[in-house]
A protein has these predicted regions:
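Catalytic phosphate/metal-binding cores of nucleic-acid and nucleotide-processing enzymes, i.e., regions
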Residues: 112-113, 147, 210-212
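A conserved beta-strand-loop-helix scaffold within acyl/acetyltransferase catalytic domains
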Residues: 137-150, 154-157
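N-terminal charged segments
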Residues: 1-90, 106, 110-127
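C-terminal "cap" of GNAT-fold acetyltransferases
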Residues: 94-102, 211-219
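Conserved beta-strand-loop-alpha-helix junction that forms the acyl-donor binding cleft
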Residues: 185-195, 199, 204, 211-217
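Conserved beta-hairpin
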Residues: 125-140
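Conserved GNAT acetyl-CoA-binding A-motif
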Residues: 49-52, 148, 177-189, 209
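Conserved acetyl-CoA-binding loop-helix of GNAT-fold acetyltransferases
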Residues: 152, 156, 162-176, 194-200
Length: 219
C-alpha cells in the first residue's frame, strides 16, 4: 500500500493527474478519505488505484491483496465496499481529462434553463454548480463532481448523430469551464461513439472510475 499520498486529498491527486503527474505505477493502492458525503469510489490509474471512502482504511487493505492490482475495480471488491458502506456500485467508466481552451466554442450555444430535462436533472444529483447549454440537436453541461473537479456530459439527439456534433459539444466544454481548470469526462467504455467523440475533442484517457452512490443522500 502506498503512503506517498496517503495523507493527501483526492483533489490533489486529480489535479496532478490532469497535469500528467500520475501516482506511481507500482501496483499499490492508496486509501483516501471521501472528499464529501456524496463522493465515494475507486479510481484506477496505470498500476495504481485510489480508493476514496469513509470506510476504515484497515478494512479496505484487508480485502486487497498486494499481488492483484486489478482487484480494486473488480466486481467482488466493489460489491463488498458498497455493502460495507451502505452504497451501491455502478458501472466502471473510462475517465478522461482535457485542459481548458480560451475563446469561444466552435458552435453556437444558448443557455438551457429547463432543469427538469432528464440529463440536467440527473447531473444535479451527482454534481454541484451545474450549467447547461443547448445547440440545435444537442446539449452540453458542466458541473463540479468528484472532489469538486469540473465534469462534462453531452447528449446528441438521435436524428443528429453521426455528423460530428458529439465531438463539437465535447470540445465546447473545454471553452466553458471557468478559472482555466481542466475538465473531466466519465464515459461508458461500451459507448464507442462517445469515446471517439471525446478523444477527437482532445480528451486523454487518465484511468477508470467506479462511483458508489448512497440512496439516503439522494445520489
Amino acid at each position: 500500500m502506498s503512503d506517498q499520498i496517503e495523507h493527501g486529498l483526492l483533489a490533489t491527486v486529480l489535479r496532478d493527474a490532469a497535469a500528467g503527474r500520475f501516482p506511481p505505477a507500482n501496483g499499490e493502492v492508496t486509501v483516501l478519505p471521501a472528499p464529501s458525503p456524496r463522493d465515494s469510489g475507486v479510481i484506477g490509474f496505470t498500476a495504481h488505484a485510489v480508493v476514496f471512502t469513509d470506510a476504515d482504511p484497515a478494512w479496505v487493505r484487508a480485502r486487497l491483496p498486494d499481488d492483484d492490482p486489478s482487484r480494486p475495480l473488480s466486481p467482488a471488491f466493489l460489491q463488498a465496499l458498497g455493502t460495507h458502506t451502505h452504497r451501491e456500485a455502478h458501472i466502471i467508466d473510462m475517465l478522461c481529462v482535457a485542459p481548458p481552451r480560451s475563446g469561444q466554442p466552435g458552435i453556437v450555444l444558448r443557455p438551457e434553463p429547463d432543469i427538469a430535462h432528464p440529463r440536467i436533472a440527473r447531473a444535479m444529483r451527482y454534481r454541484d454548480d451545474v450549467r447547461a447549454w443547448r445547440t440545435d440537436g444537442g446539449l452540453v453541461l458542466i458541473g463540479r463532481g468528484v472532489a469538486s473537479r469540473w465534469e462534462v456530459a453531452i447528449e446528441v439527439d438521435p436524428g443528429c448523430r453521426g455528423h460530428g456534433l458529439g465531438r463539437a459539444l465535447a470540445s465546447a466544454a473545454r471553452h466553458l469551464v471557468p478559472d482555466e481548470e481542466p475538465v473531466w469526462a466519465q464515459i461508458a467504455p461500451a459507448n464507442a461513439a462517445s469515446v471517439r467523440a471525446f478523444l477527437a475533442a482532445g480528451f486523454q484517457p487518465a484511468g477508470a472510475e467506479a462511483l458508489l452512490t448512497h440512496s439516503e443522500l439522494g445520489v
